[in-house]
Amino acid sequence: MENFKHLPEPFRIRVIEPVKRTTRAYREEAIIKSGMNPFLLDSEDVFIDLLTDSGTGAVTQSMQAAMMRGDEAYSGSRSYYALAESVKNIFGYQYTIPTHQGRGAEQIYIPVLIKKREQEKGLDRSKMVAFSNYFFDTTQGHSQINGCTVRNVYIKEAFDTGVRYDFKGNFDLEGLERGIEEVGPNNVPYIVATITSNSAGGQPVSLANLKAMYSIAKKYDIPVVMDSARFAENAYFIKQREAEYKDWTIEQITRETYKYADMLAMSAKKDAMVPMGGLLCVKDDSFFDVYTECRTLCVVQEGFPTYGGLEGGAMERLAVGLYDGMNLDWLAYRIAQVQYLVDGLEEIGVVCQQAGGHAAFVDAGKLLPHIPADQFPAQALACELYKVAGIRAVEIGSFLLGRDPKTGKQLPCPAELLRLTIPRATYTQTHMDFIIEAFKHVKENAANIKGLTFTYEPKVLRHFTAKLKEV
């Protein structure tokens, strides 16, 4: 099979979900009713759902079978210990707190690390800044509601869709150290390493870059949290692109990666393939005080620390999904599916970010140059794509980035991207061809697509519930 141009999906489909077809008139009415926000569409009105890969894909038969082992005890569940054992074996982290999803972990660890920095280093809350290669939207939101400014320090190649670069998700190491010195190390409560970098297009971070980042963090005694939603995809890219690790297994690369952080926070709904679940884990006893504080907050916000908002069966499923998501054949297929979609779009003249791990990212700024950033070209493109073909995608640009919480001004965004997120083991190559054909129609009408303005704008994470209208 090595010499075939395209390998088929490396799985058999056993259960299907019917979807309905709709008319153009129906979809136009639906998107207006949703306030020109695809997040607010009803799923039954969506033909191909590319909004997110978070909990929207298929599960493996081994994961489904594992659910039958679920121990639903309120405390001390066997299923918790099965999950904690998987974490130890895969990541090498000694302490595990399950959460209902990634943001459950964020709402716990962020205030704990801020408090720790304040007590131990005299952090000034009016001056505190956290750094990342690029914060995920909820991580940014939780930081901001805790009064912490966020700063993304990414390399110059990250958002240039005309440039091909192996590790576009990398930290700008000079920018990171310069930023720490500017705000004062004691005012930096944490650094978040996001793997892969979602906002940059699912772009990987090299192990060399993670090592260097961690060295800087240790120099200033700043905790590092690995945002681990797509840890397996990042490991696959390291194997493919970082020569030193080409003969390593995904499991070996993953274990090595997590030496360069103190904690991990994970939305397990991505690479661990579960419909619901998250993790907050601490590497060793050097952060045992943080683990203890986080367990206390978990009781209040998520549930008892040995279930953390998850039923026993869900913890068993996650314990298996962490392994299944690292399967090399599976990862090769998944990355190739994204590459196929990107290649097809670029063949018809639709400029994309280089293919990443979980989605194709269309450069809406180049497709719709007549729409200024403050009228959200990628959001306008998302609405047009839905009207044309019933495809739901998500804006990754100025609309998502939001306003500066101190000044109220729109934050400058490095690129206006539309994310076509591919759920795991859900859509076939035929679906990819349909998406490409839909963009042909969108491109033909691109000059007539209008910008958008708010009719309702929430103050935090506005992209989830805001409503807009055409200008």
From Swiss-Prot:
SUPFAM superfamilies in alphabetical order: PLP-dependent transferases
Modified residues (N6-(pyridoxal phosphate)lysine): K270
Catalytic activity entry: L-tryptophan + H2O = indole + pyruvate + NH4(+)
Alphabetical list of Pfam families matching this protein: Beta_elim_lyase
Cofactor(s) essential for the protein: pyridoxal 5'-phosphate
Pathway linked to the protein: Amino-acid degradation; L-tryptophan degradation via pyruvate pathway; indole and pyruvate from L-tryptophan: step 1/1
EC number, as in UniProt: 4.1.99.1
N6-acetyllysine: residues bearing it: K5, K115, K156, K450
Keyword Oxidoreductase listed: no
Top EC class, one word: lyase
Keywords for this protein: Acetylation, Lyase, Pyridoxal phosphate, Tryptophan catabolism
GO terms for MF: tryptophanase activity
Alphabetized InterPro entries for the sequence: ArAA_b-elim_lyase/Thr_aldolase, Beta-eliminating_lyase, PyrdxlP-dep_Trfase, PyrdxlP-dep_Trfase_major, PyrdxlP-dep_Trfase_small, TNase, Tryptophanase_CS
Similarity remark: Belongs to the beta-eliminating lyase family.
Subunit structure: Homotetramer.
Protein name per the record: Tryptophanase
Originating organism: Escherichia coli (strain SMS-3-5 / SECEC)
Taxonomy of the source species: Bacteria, Pseudomonadati, Pseudomonadota, Gammaproteobacteria, Enterobacterales
